[in-house]
């Protein structure tokens, strides 16, 4: 037997418990990222566009490549439904997410779609906010979410790798999207870019958005060896060169770092990119009070 719960825009079928030993394949069938609560607010409703998805590669350097998932408004008549094979937080256990995008769908035409980059936490992966990515694409945005090398569930390297590379990765994704040709390149408008960063993604967004690091950041016990983090110091030529006029707004969600002396008042005062910050009152990792 099963219980059928009808929401505003979806039907959720809840299987009656039959066994305490369900396989992960069975459990995965319920991992839907496109369900809406009956009381979902207006901005959470599905947009007017069907959604396509594709996978690309962005080059940060000759030795650093990022796998990037890209969601986009698709052509009218696109049939919804795709799955995303991914891993749980342990980096070993496979799972599958089910959404409403269509893999390699024809691209919508007739308008320009602003770009939004979604940057995951440490660890995480490009599917961490895939529910948000599908929703934004349905509203008319192109959304690019990278796997940050050295910072994913299956590739979790020293924390300093993330401290150094996160804002560099974020800019590289914009560069890769701007270099696209063909229908998707015609659709995406990289002169208007928003950046959503979760936790360490928010740390990167703060730096990329204008808040250069304080000298105390170089003394953090998990900072990369050799002083390479100095390239992000407030007032440095390298941090100034990182700034990007294409970046129009940032949305850090629980950004890590301010409670770890990564910034000071002078560095934060350099932030001139429009910012909308989200934080949780019981966040004891990024530290709500510090945010």
Segments (PLM) and residue ranges:
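Domain-level recognition of soluble alpha/beta enzyme cores
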Residues: 14, 19-116, 289
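Short substrate-entry loop that stabilizes the transition state in hydrolases
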Residues: 98, 103-113, 118-155, 260, ...
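Conserved alpha/beta-hydrolase "nucleophile elbow" surrounding the catalytic nucleophile
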Residues: 120, 197-199
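Alpha/beta-hydrolase active-site loop
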Residues: 128, 158-191, 203-209, 217-236
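Residue in the alpha/beta-hydrolase core beta-strand immediately N-terminal to the catalytic nucleophile
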Residues: 192-194, 251
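Acidic beta-to-alpha connecting loop that harbors the catalytic carboxylate
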Residues: 200, 256-257, 281-284
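Short alpha-helix in the alpha/beta-hydrolase fold that links the catalytic acid
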Residues: 264-265, 273, 286-291
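Short beta-strand/loop motif that positions the catalytic acidic residue
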Residues: 271, 277-279
């Amino acid at each position: 037997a099963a219980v059928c719960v009808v929401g505003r825009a979806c039907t959720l079928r809840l299987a009656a418990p039959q066994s305490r030993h369900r396989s992960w394949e069975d459990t995965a069938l319920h991992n839907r990222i496109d369900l809406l609560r009956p009381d979902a607010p207006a901005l959470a409703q599905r947009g007017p566009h069907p959604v396509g998805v594709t996978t690309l590669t962005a080059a940060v350097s000759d030795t650093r490549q990022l796998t990037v998932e890209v969601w986009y408004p698709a052509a009218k008549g696109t049939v919804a439904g795709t799955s995303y094979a991914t891993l749980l937080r342990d980096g070993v256990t496979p799972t599958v997410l089910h959404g409403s995008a269509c893999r390699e769908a024809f691209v919508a035409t007739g308008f320009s779609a602003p770009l939004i980059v979604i940057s995951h936490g440490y660890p995480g992966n490009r599917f961490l906010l895939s529910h948000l990515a599908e929703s934004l694409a349905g509203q008319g945005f192109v959304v690019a979410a990278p796997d940050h090398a050295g910072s994913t569930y299956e590739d979790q390297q020293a924390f300093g790798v993330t401290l150094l590379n996160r804002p560099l990765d974020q800019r590289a994704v914009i560069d890769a999207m701007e270099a696209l040709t063909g229908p998707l390149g015609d659709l995406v408008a990289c002169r208007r870019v928003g950046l959503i960063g979760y936790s360490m993604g928010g740390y990167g967004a703060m730096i990329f958005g204008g808040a250069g690091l304080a000298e105390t950041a170089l003394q953090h016990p998990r900072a990369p060896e050799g002083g390479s983090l100095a390239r992000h110091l407030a007032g440095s030529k390298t941090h100034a060169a990182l700034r990007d006029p294409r970046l129009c707004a940032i949305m850090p969600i629980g950004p890590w770092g301010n409670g770890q002396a990564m910034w000071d008042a002078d560095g934060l005062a350099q932030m001139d990119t429009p910012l909308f910050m989200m934080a949780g009152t019981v966040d004891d990792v990024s530290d709500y009070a510090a945010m």
